[in-house]
Amino acid sequence: MKINRYMKKSVITIKSDQPVSDAIALFVTHPIGMLPVIDENNKLVGVLALEDVLHLVMPASFDLVKDLDFLHDLGATENASPSSEELHQPVTNIMTSPNSTEIDFTLFHAAAIMTKHGMQDLPVIDHDGKLVGLLSHVDVGRGLIARWHLQATCKGKQE
């Protein structure tokens, strides 16, 4: 089961030299949690997760704290916002290195990468490193259960 049957081919991206404010605008206007970061040749150079942007205003220990009232008392309120300097910096300053898969790999391979790295979305590249799609954990799950459903249906007809 090849990835290209299940991936999204229309992907919202951001260029590596665009400011963080542009990324924020994309996160606000589209139901996405991750932006593939591409260069001028459409090559994947990184990923920018919504969490990367949120960490601009959240304390570094935010992920470790379970008591949100405690954070509120320390001043990490919903009114916090990034500074002008943080908003105007290029996304390359806060993006992370991309994990990706190639278009001719299987869903099982993609699932292994996503599980290993705790990813919800996985950029798909061609042999030249150019972004050609995005595969979500839902896409992978749908593809896998479709195969199981087909096998069960065929087996049921044989009996």
Regions found by a protein language model. Give the residues of each.
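A contiguous, mid-protein "functional segment" used to position or interact
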Residues: 54, 123, 128-130, 136-138
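A short, polar/charged loop-to-alpha-helix boundary motif
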Residues: 54-69, 140-154
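Bateman/CBS regulatory modules and CBS-like beta-alpha motifs in cytosolic regions of diverse proteins
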Residues: 1-32, 38-40, 44-45, 70-113, ...
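Short hydrophobic beta-strand motif reused across regulatory alpha/beta modules
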Residues: 46-51, 133-141
